[in-house]
Design a protein with these regions (language model features):
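Glycine-enriched alpha-helix->loop->beta-strand junction motifs that scaffold or abut catalytic
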Residues: 1-4, 50-55, 75-76, 129-134, ...
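Conserved, mostly hydrophobic/aromatic
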Residues: 8, 56, 70, 126, ...
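Alpha-helix-loop-beta-strand connector modules within alpha/beta enzyme cores
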Residues: 14-42, 46-50, 72-80, 102-105, ...
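C-terminal alpha-helical cap/extension of soluble enzyme domains
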Residues: 41, 82-93, 108, 114-118, ...
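Conserved anion-binding
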Residues: 43, 58-130, 144
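Glycine-rich phosphate-binding active-site loops on the catalytic face of alpha/beta enzymes
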Residues: 55-69, 82, 135-144, 193-212
Length: 218
């Protein structure tokens, strides 16, 4: 099965109550709930962490400062600025007490999206920020920021991606990316990718329905 569930609060029509229910649905499974928030701020991050998210994806990390803000929003003081609210999440993860939960919060995965030409230009500074676990290249927004909307295979987009890949591979963090097929996933693994997002809900439903109907005699 899947190792992690991508819950999208940036583009998806998902409020915090729905997010909490999705996180709770993973209880008892080996699938870790990871939530994409709207920006690297405590206001957006704290509720999803208090709901039990095991990872947070931050969009549009374009500078050292925004990367540092992402880390600060996830970590408790003194490493960060997250407020203390150990109520729902400890019960979700069966932590015996709040101190145990405080210590385990260091295991929350922080994922930085590299999805803008500004991020490419600042990639060396961004990848030096301690606390970011995964630097995830998002090609569609990146292509748009370069002026090639919808064309992730444009030479300039590929050049930008290659620059980011090379820098991330030398950093402390893992290299992540989107895959729209198993073959693309295998290619990325061969290229050093360690974290893969294997599609999304609408795509998976479309592929499943198409596969079923294509095999139907009608």
């Amino acid at each position: 099965g899947f190792d992690w569930l991508f819950i999208d609060m940036e583009h998806g029509a998902i409020d915090i109550a729905s997010c909490y229910n999705m996180i709770t649905a993973t209880s008892g499974s080996a699938c870790s709930p990871v939530v994409r928030v709207m920006e690297p701020s405590i206001a957006f991050t704290k509720p999803v962490l208090d709901s039990g998210a095991m990872g947070v994806i931050f969009p549009m990390i374009t500078s050292k400062e925004t990367a540092e803000a992402a880390v600060a929003a996830v970590r408790y003081p003194p490493a960060g600025e997250r407020g203390w609210g150990p109520f729902y999440a400890p019960m979700r993860w069966q932590k015996k007490d709040s101190i145990e939960y405080y210590k385990s919060s260091d295991d929350i995965v922080i994922i930085s999206l590299i999805e803008h030409i500004d991020a490419i230009n600042n990639i060396e500074e961004i990848t030096k920020v301690k606390g970011i676990d995964v630097f995830f290249i998002a090609p569609m927004d990146l292509a748009a920021s370069i002026g090639h909307v919808g064309d992730r295979d444009h030479p300039k987009v590929k050049e930008a991606i290659a620059k980011a890949e090379a820098c991330i591979k030398k950093s402390h963090g893992a290299l992540g990316g989107l895959c729209l097929s198993a073959s693309e996933g295998n290619d990325k693994i061969q290229n050093g990718y360690q974290v893969l997002l294997m599609g999304f809900d609408l795509l998976l439903m479309e592929v499943g329905v198409k596969s079923m109907l294509d095999g139907l005699n009608r």
